From Swiss-Prot:
GO molecular function term, any single one: magnesium ion binding
Binding site for 5-phospho-alpha-D-ribose 1-diphosphate: R79, R104, D131, P132, M133, L134, A135, T136, G137, N138, S139, D200
Chain positions recorded as uracil binding sites: I194, G199, D200, A201
Top-level taxonomic group: Bacteria
Catalyses which reaction(s): UMP + diphosphate = 5-phospho-alpha-D-ribose 1-diphosphate + uracil
Organism the protein comes from: Sinorhizobium fredii (strain NBRC 101917 / NGR234)
Co-factor(s): Mg(2+)
Protein name per its UniProtKB record: Uracil phosphoribosyltransferase
Signal peptide: none
EC number of the protein: 2.4.2.9
InterPro entries membership: PRibTrfase_dom, PRTase-like, Upp_B, UPRTase/APRTase, Ura_phspho_trans
EC class: transferase
Length: 209
């Protein structure tokens, strides 16, 4: 699919398979989510721009590469998105964090927004929006709508699983936002869950129903 990158690294796929298993414990699911988020972060940041900086090693001065521009923003769609943040922040501890409170009404499958907090100068930053699941796409669309209202121009979306229906819906509204995912699954069921999927990521991460 155009505009979609499937991250098929063997370690990503191995960990994702264990996360899919219904017998995987809450603690195990949470640990795997942290580990896989670090691997996914490598891929979604692969083409960040570098600039040269004059530094001094214990032996001599050199020109060495360093990230250019303002700090990245990781924008978590609450609550499940927070599960991806920990591993990503271990890799990029200087990143700024945005929280976007959007939940899916289980009757209408439409997003309901209840919270938004973001750093300043979004128009000068790369914003990586994170949510484990791209199902209908409605929540991620609403979150990115809000970020664009606040000036964000350079946005990427990172998830574990995506449904074809969600990808089409998402890119129908935000064709300029590339999607990075570990898997494109088969379809959505009548309740809007990704099949075969891994269940409700938030519930499995926090041990709730």
């Amino acid at each position: 699919m155009d505009g979609v990158t499937v991250i098929d690294h063997p370690l990503v796929q191995h960990k994702l398979t264990i996360m899919r298993k219904k017998e995987t414990s809450t603690a195990g699911f949470r640990r795997l989510l942290r580990e896989i988020s670090t691997l996914l972060c490598y891929e979604v940041t692969r083409d960040l721009e570098l600039t040269m900086e004059r530094i001094e090693t214990p032996l001599q001065e050199i020109d060495a590469p360093i990230l250019e521009g303002k700090k990245l923003v990781f924008a978590s769609i609450l609550r499940a998105g927070n599960g991806l943040l920990e591993g990503m922040l271990e890799l990029v501890p200087s990143a700024r964090v945005s929280h976007i409170g959007v939940y899916r009404d289980h009757e209408t499958l439409q997003p309901v927004e209840y919270y938004f907090k973001a750093p300043d100068s979004l128009n000068e930053r790369l914003v990586i929006v994170v949510d484990p699941m791209l199902a209908t796409g409605n929540s991620s669309i609403a979150a990115i709508d809000k970020l664009k209202e606040r000036g964000a121009k350079n946005i990427r979306f990172l998830c574990l699983l995506a449904a074809p229906e969600g990808i089409r819906n998402f890119h129908g509204v935000h064709p300029d936002v590339p999607i990075f995912t570990a898997s494109i699954d088969s379809h959505l069921n009548e309740k809007g869950y990704i099949v075969p999927g891994l269940g409700d990521a938030g519930d499995r991460m926090y041990g709730t129903k």
